[in-house]
Amino acid sequence: MKFAFLTSTPLSPTEGSGTFVGIRELERALEALGHAVEIRPLRVRSGFHTLDRWLYNAGLVLAPPDADVAVGFDLDGFLWARRRRIPFVASLKGIIADELLNERGRTRALLSIQARWERRNVARADRVLVTSRYCAGVVERVYGVPSKRIAVVPEPIDLEDWQGRFARALRRPSERPTILSVARMYPRKRLEDLLEAVALLRRRLPDVRLSIVGDGPEGDRLLRRHAALGLGDAVVFLGEVSRNRLAEEYVNADCFCLPSVQEGFGIVLLEAMAAGLPIVACRAAAVPEVVPDGVTGRLVEPRSPERLADALEEILTDSRRRKDYGDAGRRRAAEFSAPGVAQRFLEAAREA
């Protein structure tokens, strides 16, 4: 089959975040199975993302995709879909109407506009793919899509690629227990809760260290909170890094923490488990579907630095528990291998 992937999300790990990773992993997996994939990316950028997304979609009307099946990611395809001549699948990597609930001000207002476009997109699609049962429920409840038109296809991970990167990564000698977090700095990621947790944890584990990979609109506010808590070199902000450098951070950490209160899936959780890291995260949104509590790590109530600190201490001070969670995490990550997820995608797309 020939697929046209429609996406106005920047195709770079720096700006596209987990959406970029998921699209690229799926593209490679489908091509490995003998299918053709043409990505129709965003080419012209004004600096105003919502405007760019509308212009991109207007352009699809003027130059329609040529394929057996078109796949529009998130809101993409919403203008073209009403006059399409080929099957159309809407693949939602995150539900915009759900994500905006944790945003503020101008960002929330712009996301509200995008959510209306996404609603139109899923209404016009022959099939709607989501990454988790949680997202399926949100799409049915908020966008009014009947459950029979929705299929769950999780995010894929290229285990062979990551295992190669882990094997080549530099191991740095360190006596300090190290926590790693990888996230775009949005309010919904709740990284301030992790900073608070580290401040509490230092009273019990004075040498604990937190490395944060990622950037975003909350960056300045997090730096100010870091200073106010007096965390000093206990926290390192690494910004955006290459995949090779990210692999190095994974193999040099003792534990992975993502305190997010809203995740449609959480592809970084797969990456961390593939690296054998025990997970501490929040019992929120789709996270429990990816991280079984007490099997690959610990899930705690959202917005609770105290419970985060307790769970982190439990893992960092128990080497046997770290190993058991890490081994289980590797097995769990293997359940989302890219070839298997690509097959699930194909089955769902053929029903469009």
Locations of regions flagged by a protein language model:
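Active-site proximal beta-strand in glycosyltransferases
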Residues: V69-V71, R83-L101, L129
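Short alpha-helical donor nucleotide-sugar binding micro-motif in glycosyltransferases
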Residues: E240-V241, E248-A253
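Membrane-proximal helix-turn-helix segments that form the acceptor-binding/catalytic region
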Residues: A109-V128
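Short hydrophobic beta-strand element within catalytic cores of glycosyltransferases
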Residues: P278-A281, V291
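Aromatic "clamp/platform" in nucleotide-sugar-dependent glycosyltransferases that forms part
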Residues: V261
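Conserved donor-binding/catalytic core segment of Leloir-type glycosyltransferases
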Residues: R171-V198, S211
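Conserved acidic donor-binding segment of nucleotide-sugar-dependent glycosyltransferases
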Residues: D293-G294, R298-P305, E314-S319
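Carbohydrate-associated surface elements
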Residues: Y134, P156
